[in-house]
Curated annotation (Swiss-Prot):
The keyword Kinase applies. The gene is argB. The record marks K29, K239 as: Transition state stabilizer. Substrate binds at G64, G65, R86, N179. It is found in: Cytoplasm. This is Acetylglutamate kinase. The keyword ATP-binding applies. It comes from Campylobacter hominis (strain ATCC BAA-381 / DSM 21671 / CCUG 45161 / LMG 19568 / NCTC 13146 / CH001A). Pathway: Amino-acid biosynthesis; L-arginine biosynthesis; N(2)-acetyl-L-ornithine from L-glutamate: step 2/4.
Length: 283
């Protein structure tokens, strides 16, 4: 009886957030362990369906680095990285596109639909969703950045109750294919839509201080200071920079959460304290 009562309390405590978030646009960057562990994948799909059922408009951008590495290794193609980005030559980009758009994207979409969603799997090439240009003058090969987002296409999908699942592959005006960093892709899409929230699923709890403790609330000024003193470093820098870019471009809140925790999205969004790090301009 106590357990049932506790469950009821949890549901009731979520009601204010459900009311607040109805009809809002949330962009979810899906990657890391949450994308490879079968139980976590199922939890993620069910959480997304629940968010959609309570009236939140969801857009998912996914990565697929582990699957890309496995496929490149299988085909005997060497992987190289610089500045945290995959150096992508002409042969590799064909494989990356095949894996992200043809395999990973459709697997995510199918799992969502099996659990009651109305998801549609697309990439940046579809309906000219994303227009790309080469990053850093071609330093990383066929790695691009987003020049333009077809906002009207995304809004049409959301209006018709779809959940877009987007593979970060796009073309430029010459119809050359580019691999886009999924964090940056999610950031550009959220910024273009002026989304209410963007959520990055990571493999750690969020931004940690020098004692390894979670910093639950950050603003751009604090982030700049933490980068200067080395508290924020390494692989967290691209994610936190993406958060700041979103906030500076009209996204109200950015979150970094641990996707290895079951139902982490619900725990972050529907509880008072959350479980990760939230970035906003003013608290």
């Amino acid at each position: 009886m106590i357990k049932k009562s506790k469950t009821a309390e949890v549901i009731i405590s979520a009601l204010p957030y459900i009311r607040k978030f109805r009809d809002k646009i949330f962009v979810i960057k899906y990657g890391g362990a949450a994308q490879t562990d079968d139980n976590l994948k199922l939890n993620f799909a069910r959480d997304i369906v629940l968010l959609h059922m309570v009236g939140i408009k969801i857009i998912i951008i996914h990565g697929g680095g582990k699957k890309i590495n496995q496929t490149l290794d299988l085909l005997g193609v060497k992987s190289e990285f610089a500045d945290g980005l995959r150096i992508t030559d002409k042969k590799s980009i064909e494989i990356v596109e095949m894996v992200l758009s043809g395999a990973v994207n459709k697997q995510i979409t199918a799992l969502l639909n099996q659990n009651g969603a109305k998801a549609i799997g697309i990439c940046g090439k579809d309906a000219n969703l994303l227009e790309a240009e080469v990053l850093s003058g071609g330093k990383y090969g066929f790695v691009g950045e987003i020049k333009n987002v077809n906002v009207n296409f995304l809004k049409d999908l959301l209006t018709n109750d779809y959940i877009p699942v987007i593979a970060p592959i796009a073309a430029n005006e010459k119809n050359e294919t580019f691999n886009i960093n999924a964090d940056l892709c999610a950031s550009k899409i959220a910024s273009a839509l002026k989304a209410d929230k963007i959520v990055f699923l990571s493999d750690i709890d969020g931004v940690l201080d020098k004692n390894g403790e979670l910093i639950s609330k950050l603003n751009p000024n604090l982030i700049e200071n933490l980068k200067k003193d080395g508290t924020i470093s390494g692989g967290m820098i691209p994610k936190i920079d993406a958060c700041v870019e979103c906030i500076e471009n009209g996204v109200k809140n950015a979150h970094i959460i641990n996707g290895k925790i079951p139902h982490s999205i619900l725990l972050e969004l529907f509880t008072d304290n959350g479980i990760g790090s939230m970035v906003k301009e003013v608290f």
